């Protein structure tokens, strides 16, 4: 999903934009932006467990095409309790602080259906963009999202379908499979700050 806000930046020239990596299970923003993530790098998860940290000190400036436009708060070390952290008062307070400094804040989250982490984030969003990929996303996800809309859990909803091949017929078919996997494991005995991605 991180590719969606990055694409939108093309239309936000001159605006102050923050991208928050709130997928605390399988963070990918660093890969998309070419940032070499280390397991002990502080980020969102660090700020949510340690109120003494200064949020602004852990926000990165993006160079290259989006220099001067995009700031990023990376996910930080993978915690054992992502849903709890994202639903905490600490996260609410952090957003209240950051929104004073930015015109737009994008929150990249884990897939709604597979984990509960993203559910608490919905209440903060003015717009929820749900990203699906042709020949990739399981069609069984649709009823779940539709129920959230029907139950008014989502206020404003946008659906993005990407990966469509021009002239191909495959996107009319629905034999999709969702391939979201977690390349890590929890190590409760090691305390906070662990991680398997040391690249």
Tell what function each PLM region has.
Residues 1-199:
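P-loop NTP-binding module
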């Amino acid at each position: 999903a991180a590719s969606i806000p990055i694409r939108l930046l093309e239309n936000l020239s001159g605006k102050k934009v923050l991208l928050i990596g709130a997928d605390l299970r399988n963070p990918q923003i660093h890969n998309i932006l070419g940032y070499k993530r280390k397991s002990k790098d502080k980020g969102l998860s660090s700020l949510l467990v340690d109120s003494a940290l200064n949020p602004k000190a852990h926000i990165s400036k993006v160079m290259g095409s989006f220099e001067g436009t995009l700031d990023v708060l990376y996910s930080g070390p993978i915690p054992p309790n992502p849903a709890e952290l994202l639903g905490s008062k600490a996260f609410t307070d952090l957003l209240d602080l950051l929104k004073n400094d930015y015109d737009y804040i994008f929150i990249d989250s884990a897939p709604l259906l597979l984990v509960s982490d993203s559910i608490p984030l919905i209440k903060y969003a003015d717009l929820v963009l749900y990203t699906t990929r042709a020949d990739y996303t399981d069609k069984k996800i649709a009823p779940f999202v539709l129920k959230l809309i029907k139950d008014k859990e989502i206020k404003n909803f946008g659906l993005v379908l990407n990966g469509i091949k021009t002239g191909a017929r495959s996107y009319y078919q629905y034999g999709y499979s969702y391939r979201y996997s977690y390349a890590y494991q929890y190590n409760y005995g090691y305390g906070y700050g662990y991680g398997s991605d040391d690249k």
